[in-house]
Amino acid sequence: MEKSQGYLELDKSWRHDFLYPLIFQEYIYALAHEQGLNRSILLENTDHDNKYSSLIVKRLITRMQQQNHFLIFDNDSNQNPFWKHNNNLYSQMISEGFVIIVEIPFSPRFVDSLEEKKKILKFNNLRSIHSIFPFLEDQILHLNFVSNILIPYPIHLEIVVQSLRYRVKDASSLHLLRFFLFTLNKSISSFSKRNPRLFLFLYNSHVYEYESTFLFLRNKTSHLRSTSSGAFLERIFFYGKIKHLIEVFANDFQAILWLFKDPFMHYVRYQGKSILASKRTSLRMNKWKYYLINFWQCQFYVWSQPGRVSINQLSNHSLDFLGYLSSVRLNPLAVRSQMLENSFLTDNAIKKFDIIVLLIPLIGSLAKAKFCNVLGHPLSKPARADSSDSDIIERFVRICRNLSHYHSGSSKKKSLYRIKYILRLSCARTLARKHKTAVRSFLKRLGSELLEEFLTEDGQVISLIFPRTSSTSWRLYRGGIWYLDITCINDLANHE
């Protein structure tokens, strides 16, 4: 009931375009704490619960409700180490709570509730990460060239705030955002390290602005010939001065229309990179490349070098992104044909989109988290004295399950079996270290039960694909499985 009441208050505040009062609500910080736990696969931060205790949250809200509540970040108080620690904690809590608030305009829950009143546009880009790969499986086999694009960062933090003004109309919230950006953070690099979640949200909202422009151009190309470029450029998505972009469009407007009318152009974005694939020639891809660079510089004041956009032919290039190595390879196929008394062989080549997991970077991520060494030999993790055996096993099984879910689309399962072996033996070494016994004797006592814990999830998933009656298909299934409920990449998979 309390959670429903909280959503009603959020809905009420958003209907009045006034989100700032939500920063004083305790459930905002509870939501931030819950989402922080869900996003962390390793859960190594043992003081996370203490950091978000109810007493600390109430103390923070009380201080913010004072007349000069931002004096808690005063530089004079930072001379005392105790106050400096508290100020850093308060700053982190406010920034994480602020992310919950500014994400409201992008939430599907509120988009659906406000769609009838036409207050905001409906966003269709809130999709699973795994939805990229089925799309590539269906489309990339028919394409010839691909561009790997490193999306540039804005040169100034104020550009990010300006991009957010259309989505968040509450001036007080924008002033609070500027306070975080310019008072507590001196540069984009320091801001991304101190407030990673807020930085990712602002970066994604900034990138979405020029992506929405591309979507508009793609959908409206059939109507642009009867619309003057000046009137077109006055649309609400553009915020800054438009004289530079008008010059770009005025040079060769018909050529730009021809460029956007490519029906075989596909665009995919992931993290700080994007992929632009087309069936056309390399000349068309080069025109896209320089148009993107000019568009970033003239409209969004973002400087980008031509080297950040590389063009490759799909037949001899592999896509390394999101923990997978994807490539288009030719499978030779010999077909014997019989015509009357004559028989002959026909050689065919079939294109296949192959997706595999990179084992070496994944082992490097496990080694960084101290589950194994750089050679892949399992290591024991230090266990807390008050942790039970079931808690330790559950933690390792959760990590193994998340990795198996994320990399379940691989066409070769041998790499996943190696990762499961490392985690299973690391779990056994951790338990043996806790009980001060040998690993061999501990595995003899708990080996079968521990193995069942790590393999139960795979059996449940495959049983949804094949019924238990078809035991042969159930045992021999080696195809990829894509989960359409994965909305964030886990820490171990993010080895780019």
Swiss-Prot record:
Any one Gene Ontology biological process term? tRNA processing
Q: What is its main location?
A: plastid
- Out of the domains of life, which is the source? Eukaryota
Q: Which InterPro entries match?
A: Domain_X, Maturase_MatK, Maturase_MatK_N
- Where in or outside the cell is it found? Plastid, Chloroplast
Q: Which GO terms describe its molecular function?
A: RNA binding
Q: Name one GO cellular component term.
A: chloroplast
Q: Which Pfam families match?
A: Intron_maturas2, MatK_N
For this UniProt record, give its keywords in alphabetical order, as a comma-separated list.
Chloroplast, mRNA processing, Plastid, RNA-binding, tRNA processing
Describe the function of this protein: Usually encoded in the trnK tRNA gene intron. Probably assists in splicing its own and other chloroplast group II introns.
Family from the record: Belongs to the intron maturase 2 family. MatK subfamily.
Q: What is this protein called?
A: Maturase K
